[in-house]
UniProtKB/Swiss-Prot annotation:
Pfam families: Ribosomal_L33 (PF00471). The keyword Ribonucleoprotein applies. GO terms for biological process: translation. This is Large ribosomal subunit protein bL33. NCBIfam families: PRK00595.1, rpmG_bact.
Length: 55
């Protein structure tokens, strides 16, 4: 069976609230770590989220 191209990743808030999003990314085209500015409802503002592995 072939290896999956899309990988599930976890985007963790840099505001240290413990809030995270789960999303997918194409591991062949996006080799670097993903960072996004998204809304953190615990901090109640937009902060940067960084990619980590799902355990």
């Amino acid at each position: 069976m072939a290896k999956a191209v899309t990988v599930k990743i976890k985007l963790v808030s840099t505001a240290d609230t413990g809030y995270f999003y789960v999303t997918k990314k194409n591991s062949r085209t996006q080799t670097e770590k993903l960072t996004m500015r998204k809304y953190d409802p615990v901090a109640r503002k937009h902060v940067e989220f960084k990619e980590t592995k799902i355990k």
